[in-house]
Amino acid sequence: MEQELMRIGVSLPDNLLNKFDSIIEGRGYSSRSEGIRDSIRTYINQYEWMSDIRGRRVGTITIIYDHTKRGLSNAVADIQHDYSDLIKSSVHIHLDHDNCLEVIIFDGEGELIKEMDERLMALKGVKYVKLNTAPPAEKI
């Protein structure tokens, strides 16, 4: 049985929509709506996977943020200090005049890792957050 489709409206910046349109055209989607549905499915799968992080985990959180946004660099650092027991190392590079990339390497309890990731994601001015986890070596 086919599901009923709901019509929604979304406001996006021009550059984001143009990039999205280029991607869906290149991938052969029949419509923008199909590309959006696929993107939402991917987002839901990622969120559900991330929500199920339990036990000891190792991995990285990669973030890109605008360091010119008032207080953001300090907020990123404060969050890292709040989870210093988990963080084994971090790398910070300057991508351009305004943007920085940080890779945070961690080893610890999955629920705390998820909490740290969500706090970083919620900061205004953070443009990208990617969490990658793996079980510790002894479980592989």
Swiss-Prot record:
<keyword id="KW-0479">Metal-binding</keyword>
<protein>
    <recommendedName>
        <fullName>Putative nickel-responsive regulator</fullName>
    </recommendedName>
</protein>
<dbReference type="GO" id="GO:0003677">
    <property type="term" value="F:DNA binding"/>
</dbReference>
<dbReference type="InterPro" id="IPR045865">
    <property type="entry name" value="ACT-like_dom_sf"/>
</dbReference>
<dbReference type="InterPro" id="IPR013321">
    <property type="entry name" value="Arc_rbn_hlx_hlx"/>
</dbReference>
<dbReference type="GO" id="GO:0010045">
    <property type="term" value="P:response to nickel cation"/>
</dbReference>
<dbReference type="GO" id="GO:0016151">
    <property type="term" value="F:nickel cation binding"/>
</dbReference>
<comment type="similarity">
    <text>Belongs to the transcriptional regulatory CopG/NikR family.</text>
</comment>
<keyword id="KW-0533">Nickel</keyword>
<dbReference type="InterPro" id="IPR014864">
    <property type="entry name" value="TF_NikR_Ni-bd_C"/>
</dbReference>
<keyword id="KW-0805">Transcription regulation</keyword>
<feature type="binding site">
    <location>
        <position position="81"/>
    </location>
    <ligand>
        <name>Ni(2+)</name>
    </ligand>
</feature>
<dbReference type="GO" id="GO:0003700">
    <property type="term" value="F:DNA-binding transcription factor activity"/>
</dbReference>
<dbReference type="InterPro" id="IPR002145">
    <property type="entry name" value="CopG"/>
</dbReference>
<feature type="binding site">
    <location>
        <position position="94"/>
    </location>
    <ligand>
        <name>Ni(2+)</name>
    </ligand>
</feature>
<dbReference type="InterPro" id="IPR010985">
    <property type="entry name" value="Ribbon_hlx_hlx"/>
</dbReference>
<dbReference type="InterPro" id="IPR050192">
    <property type="entry name" value="CopG/NikR_regulator"/>
</dbReference>
<dbReference type="InterPro" id="IPR027271">
    <property type="entry name" value="Acetolactate_synth/TF_NikR_C"/>
</dbReference>
<feature type="binding site">
    <location>
        <position position="100"/>
    </location>
    <ligand>
        <name>Ni(2+)</name>
    </ligand>
</feature>
<comment type="function">
    <text>Transcriptional regulator.</text>
</comment>
<feature type="binding site">
    <location>
        <position position="92"/>
    </location>
    <ligand>
        <name>Ni(2+)</name>
    </ligand>
</feature>
<dbReference type="Pfam" id="PF08753">
    <property type="entry name" value="NikR_C"/>
</dbReference>
<keyword id="KW-0238">DNA-binding</keyword>
<dbReference type="InterPro" id="IPR022988">
    <property type="entry name" value="Ni_resp_reg_NikR"/>
</dbReference>
<dbReference type="Pfam" id="PF01402">
    <property type="entry name" value="RHH_1"/>
</dbReference>
<keyword id="KW-0804">Transcription</keyword>
